[in-house]
A protein has these predicted regions:
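A structural signal for well-ordered alpha-helices, especially hydrophobic packing surfaces
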Residues: 114, 118, 122, 146-153, ...
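Structural helix-adjacent loops and short alpha-helical linkers that scaffold large soluble proteins
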Residues: 73-86, 118-139, 171-188, 228-243, ...
Length: 286
């Protein structure tokens, strides 16, 4: 692994992106989002102004969630076209689009999805290497996007948590890149503080938020905790105490809930899986 190859970080949403039909569509240049389909054959031109004419389609597309489906397809079917398509769609964005393009939320999800999917591609037995120019361009774009995101962080709430986590993912995946150490030193302590604020042990002090948002945010903290374990980051005892209390509350069935399984996009499904991570030995605490 060279300095421009990302280290694999834990992805808590990997199991939600196993759509082979979607991966085939992306290979064919068909991008379906928010109920609309746009065909971009060959090398996608992300600078096309007409793409922005459908804001809902554009907002979903530029998060690059489908790169995880491409990686799953490549890992499962081992056909080169999935790797080639990933390089085309991601490489084109990295080469043609400014690092500050899009909302901070979209940017945070985009850098995570690029890194998660890249690492998954490399785990396939069929993987050889990315084209050097694509690898260099994507890494440079990731670092520049992360630096820009740091200047546009939300001031509070679940949006700030996810954006901080995106910075941590970049820092852990690309530790040898300039600025990564600073990102890690900034993002990880900030996530500690967010954990204590967003999920106090006294549930009466827990802020009022939508159940979906709260679950998504807790899933983010679980992923952050697992990556702290993987990469040996120091973890304060208070972080684990608040996290365990939040998990126990979240997994308790509510009176209005039924025994029906969660839909695949429900963050509680990911929470149930990620909660298993907490049964592993914790990293050294500071």
């Amino acid at each position: 692994m060279n300095a421009r190859t990302p280290r694999p970080v834990y992805c808590s949403t990997w199991h939600l992106h196993h759509n082979l039909a979607l991966a085939r569509d992306i290979c064919a240049g068909r991008f379906t989002h928010a109920g609309a389909t746009i065909v971009m054959g060959g090398q996608p031109d992300w600078t096309r102004k007409d793409l922005r004419a459908m804001p809902a389609w554009w907002a979903e597309c530029i998060e690059f969630n489908y790169t995880l489906d491409l990686a799953f397809a490549f890992h499962t079917i081992r056909e080169q076209r999935y790797l080639d398509t990933w390089q085309r769609v991601v490489g084109a964005w990295a080469a043609d689009m400014r690092p500050d393009y899009g909302s901070p939320d979209a940017l945070a999800r985009r850098v995570q999805n690029w890194l998660y999917s890249w690492a998954a591609l490399e785990e396939s037995l069929s993987f050889t290497e990315l084209e050097p120019i694509v690898q260099e361009t994507v890494v440079e774009s990731l670092c520049r996007q992360a630096q820009h995101l740091k200047t546009r962080l939300a001031s509070k709430g679940h949006r700030r948590t996810e954006q901080l986590y995106a910075l941590l993912v970049v820092a852990l995946a690309l530790p040898d890149q300039e600025g990564s150490a600073d990102l890690r030193r900034f993002a990880w302590p900030e996530l500690h503080r967010r954990m204590l604020v967003e999920f106090p042990i006294d549930r009466r002090r827990h802020r009022a938020v939508g159940a979906h948002e709260s679950m998504v945010e807790l899933r983010t903290f679980l992923a952050a905790r697992e990556n702290a374990r993987r990469f040996g980051l120091p973890v304060q005892a208070s972080f684990d105490e608040h996290l365990m209390a939040a998990v126990e509350r979240a997994l308790m069935p509510q009176p209005e809930e039924t025994s029906m399984p969660f839909p695949v996009t429900d963050p509680r499904d990911s929470l149930a899986i990620a909660a298993e991570l907490l049964r592993r030995p914790f990293a050294s605490r500071s």
